[in-house]
Amino acid sequence: MKKIAKFLIVLGMMGQLSSCDYLDIVPDERAQESDTWKTEGAVRGYLYSCYGYLPANRTFGNSYWLAEELTAVTKELFTTFKYGYYRPVSLGFTSNTWSTIWNGIHQCYMFQESLKQVSNEYVTDEMKKQYLAESNFLIAYYHFLSMRSYGPTMIIRSVIDLETPISGFPERSSIDEVVAFINEKLDEAMSEGGLPTTWSGKDYGRATRLAALALKSRVYLYAASPLYNGNTEMYADFRSPLDGRQLIAQEKSQAKWEISATQTKYAIDEVEKAKFHLYHDADAGEPSDAKPGLPNKAQRRLRYTNIDNQTGNNPEIIWADTRNDDYYGIQRRCPPRQTLGGKFAGISMTNCPTLQTIEAFYTKNGLPINKDKTFDYDERYE
């Protein structure tokens, strides 16, 4: 009887615990998908997340794009290939370009779907048009990165469900189809003034109309180049496994060069109208204690080309990467080697041009150094 009484008491206490308000979470503070479009700041943060998949080309640790004719560095991740250290278990060494690109495209399309649900109370129609334009630019740019890395690649036109099997993904499209799609998205981005000509202040680094024009120029140049324009030597058998169609054009087209030239000339003209230009002596401003004058104007121009000018923005840069440089960034690898400790530790000149690059420069007479009779080729290192 006592056991039964104790059991009933315990059971009653458990019932009280289950019905109390102490353990209830009111309100539920877990983030919901709808929170991403409840405020202007949240929507802008969602847009900025679409930029988060841009490759960090300044980080030398992931610089598989470096080639020996451009620069020489030591102890970088890509050296694992030549030393034979790279193995299937070494996946941590790679920058995983493939996944990053497609995740970025997926994020952009998800953002566009969410943007449709945003109330005008938080984001005006004009801002929506601008945000949509930026995401279209990024979709185009990510497809360009995929084409640059892998040639004929997939074209993604909308959100793909995460549960989609491999068989449900689109196959590779031809280079001509990829080029057409990229330019279609860029035209959408630039339509109705969606992209501004330039940004300044905290918005510096976001997509602009000039960046879109520059990208169109680059894409058409790829399409016209011998790599993809009539390359029968390397890609005669590069066909779709499904229907056998050619993925890279086998007939040279002069029209592609004409289109490339027209697009490039237009991009240059528009950039110059916006007051962008090659860096000159005057852009560095007058000498000061912080910026002492150098005896040679060319040295002064080179010194400040990338780091300083009167307005704070380099007039050569059309689309800037404004992310902070990290420990392994290119800036840390360029200054002369430091022997001091503390904050200077690790700074060293580990990035430098190769002799092959230096010898590729022409003389003042416009000739290769081994062809110019006025240049003392035998004593070139003296």
Task: Outline where the language-model segments fall.
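Alpha-solenoid helical repeat scaffolds
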Residues: 118, 145, 149-152, 158, ...
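Bacterial Sec-dependent N-terminal signal peptides
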Residues: 1-28
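Short linear capping/connector segments at secondary-structure termini
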Residues: 29-32, 86-87, 158-166
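Short glycine/proline- and charge-enriched loop/turn segments
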Residues: 161-167, 239-244
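Conserved, well-structured interaction surfaces
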Residues: 38-57, 77-150, 164-204
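An aromatic- and glycine-enriched ligand-binding surface/loop that stacks and positions planar moieties
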Residues: 21-79, 153, 209-210, 220-382
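Secondary-structure transition into beta-strands, especially the periplasmic turns and strand N-termini
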Residues: 5, 17-19, 120-129, 133-136, ...
